[in-house]
Amino acid sequence: MDVSYYDGPKDEVAEAMLKSAVTAMRLGQYEDGKGRLEEIMEFGTSNFQLLGTIYMYYGRVCRHLNHDAKALEFFEHELNMFKLIFNYPEACDSTRRIVEQALKMGKFPKARRFAEDLIDYTSNKKNGEKYIGQARILFASVCLEGCERDVESNQDEKKKLLSICAEQIAAVKLFNENNTEGAVSETKIMLLEAKCLSLDEKYEESRRKYQECIDFAIKTDQFEAVHIAYYDKALYAETDLLFFIIRDLRSALFYATKFGKERDVVKYKSKLSEEMLRNGEFHEAYLYGLEALVSIRKLGLNEYIGDVLLTIAKCLIALGKRRQAAYFIILGSVLTINQNSFKLFYEQIDVAMNQERSETATDQDVCLAIDSSPDPTSSNDMINKFVVELEHATNVETWEMIVNGIIDDQKKPVAIEKKENEEPVDMMDLIFSMSSRMDDQRTELPAARFIPPRPVSSASKKTTKSHRILPGLRANWTKVQSMKFDGHTMNRILKRSKKSKSSLDSTNSMQGDDTRSDDVTMTSK
């Protein structure tokens, strides 16, 4: 049986539920979207393509909510589903998501194994050969990421990763020469080549390759590749070439603003701010950092906020604006209280207080009253009213106690002060006021509230064997096994099902460790 067709009628109810979940996610209602997706899996479907898509969205919403282990688990479910039905493009995308998530979680060996597995999967299947170029590019990217993150402390192992990357790039070039269908973009190849040369400390060759990539991308109107090439060229240049680094970052920001994503613009502004600070261009660095901070809060890109706050604080100290710097130092200290970077913020408050002491008369107390005026979104009254005293910066342990005190004070409920000579409230006025308010609420409901209602499942709540093996699968498992599937993937799924009887009920604990993470799609070579 051709698995591109499914046994049974099209599952219109599950599709309607999925559209409802996606709508909620697009409105920023991620918890609601997550709940709707869980309802779909509880409802169940026999449409394998649809179920793979459901897994993909569930993984994405978990990733957004920082439920990393659960996101990784469902990206693996997604990959298994698409590999079962020989959907090679989706299998490539699923593997890329798994690799990105695994690298985010610091699981380099897992990312590498999945990338290698994709090469095996595509090269051993007749209809998958045209996707092997994408698989090799992904594997090369993983090797470079591992080399860049110093996951291998042994220099010989790092050299081995670079050698593997070079081999994969050469294989992709050969693939492109012999295949027009599925050929990998030349700009992707050149970007990887240039990065490989940079990490191998062949800087002159790397610069030439990046420039070649930029010229080719402009000529072929691939402007997204232009800003990536400029950024990478700056990122991997020798650290003493500040003038050229800043120039390339400006070019990257220019092209990203016109042709890139908002996330790219934030990343480039953050990096440009750091390098301009290093070059002594304090005020311009401060302005770029402040712009990046506003965008970070708007887009929820919290992975950048600590670095940006630290850069802004350093710029303000260099400009002699210590009261304003203290505000950003406290913000950063609160955010990084349990992280290694907390010490970096302590070092800055120590610098600021020492400067303040040198400019304060001996008969006066050394202190800094917080000035939050540069922050357009400042609304934290607890921090705004705080005064940093010299004793607070005695050492990092003392500063940690002070910051923990601020955090504890923020958690306390705000006391409502009773106004003096306050007249008693007239009961009839209160009733009319509440009635009018309710009328306004009934007539001015926001459009976002009118999301399509969640369809109610009429399916049995009993968990079937198929549902335990793949959450949301409602099918006769004996009949499913008779269909034309990828046998190796099927065997892996069945093997795992014997080890775990987990079903959708296990998703109640969304942040638990994925104990099955290394035993999902591995194949023996």
Curated annotation (Swiss-Prot):
GO molecular function: G-protein alpha-subunit binding; GDP-dissociation inhibitor activity
A single Gene Ontology CC term: aster
Swiss-Prot/TrEMBL keywords: Cell cycle, Cell division, Cytoplasm, Cytoskeleton, Mitosis
Gene3D superfamilies hit by this protein: Tetratricopeptide repeat domain
Cell compartment(s), UniProt: Cytoplasm, Cell cortex; Cytoplasm, Cytoskeleton, Spindle
Domain of life per record: Eukaryota
GO biological process: cell division; establishment of mitotic spindle localization; mitotic spindle elongation; nuclear migration; regulation of G protein-coupled receptor signaling pathway
Ranges for region Disordered: 488-525
Main location: cytoplasm
Domain GoLoco: 424-445
Family matches, as SUPFAM superfamilies: TPR-like
Null mutant phenotype: Simultaneous RNAi-mediated knockdown of both gpr-1 and gpr-2 causes, in the 1-cell embryo, a decrease in nuclear and spindle movements during prophase, reduced asymmetric spindle elongation during anaphase and mispositioning of nuclei after cell division.
Cited function: In the 1-cell embryo, probably together with gpr-2, controls nuclear rotation and spindle elongation during mitosis. Complex of gpr-1 and gpr-2, in association with lin-5, activates G-protein signaling to affect mitotic spindle force. Polarity determinants (par genes) may regulate lin-5/gpr-1/gpr-2/goa-1 locally to create the asymmetric forces that drive spindle movement.
Quaternary structure (record): Interacts with gpr-1, lin-5 and GDP-bound goa-1.
Name the UniProt record assigns to this protein: G-protein regulator 1
Organism: Caenorhabditis elegans
Source organism phylogeny: Eukaryota, Metazoa, Ecdysozoa, Nematoda, Chromadorea
The gene coding this protein: gpr-1
